[in-house]
A protein has these predicted regions:
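Feature captures the FAD/FMN-dependent oxidoreductase FAD-binding
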Residues: 87-134
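Short hydrophobic core segments
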Residues: 28-30, 53, 126, 134
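Glycine-rich FAD pyrophosphate-binding loop
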Residues: 28, 44-64
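Conserved N-terminal glycine-rich FAD pyrophosphate-binding loop of Rossmann-like flavoproteins
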Residues: 3-5, 21, 56-79
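Extreme N-terminal leader/targeting segments of oxidoreductases
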Residues: 1-27, 112, 116
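Glycine-rich Rossmann-fold phosphate-binding loop(s) that bind the pyrophosphate
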Residues: 31-35
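Conserved FAD-binding subdomain of flavin-dependent enzymes
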Residues: 42, 58, 72-93
Length: 134
């Protein structure tokens, strides 16, 4: 039988620890769409302490829906190197254009970003901005 007290305590303590460790950051990113996720990945990979805040339950923005509500997206040649770095499959459609499974793309960049050290907080709205010197 599962002990709900242990489950609740584990969730609350773990999340609180993650949140408290993110009170001082090098970079805070608002919005976990494709741009926010890639920015978080690149900054965390570079060794910065980064957290990403998303007001919705799910991250990835509209990319889940792909193009025309088909879960396929098209990227151009300039993005191919990043997709390769993220181990996301890109199939050549025609010269300079690649087709990518939208679900693989959102999932792939999310996993790589988290593994690089990005902390993601969904269901959090950001209302104020503080910029500190240095």
């Amino acid at each position: 039988m599962i002990d709900e007290r242990i489950v609740t305590k584990a969730i609350v303590e773990s999340y609180t620890k993650k949140l408290l460790s993110s009170l001082e950051l090098d970079v805070a990113i608002c919005g976990a769409g494709p741009a926010g996720l890639v920015a978080g990945y690149c900054l965390a990979k570079a060794g910065l302490k980064v957290a990403l805040f998303e007001r919705k339950l799910s991250i990835g923005g509209g990319m889940w829906g792909g193009g025309m509500m088909f879960n396929e997206i098209v990227v151009q040649e300039e993005a191919k190197a990043l997709l390769d770095e993220l181990d996301i499959t890109a199939r050549l459609y025609t010269e300079g254009y690649y087709v990518v499974d939208a679900i693989e793309c959102v999932s792939g960049v999310s996993v790589k970003a988290i593994k690089a050290g990005l902390k993601i907080f969904n269901l959090v709205s950001v209302e104020d901005l503080i910029v500190r010197e240095n």
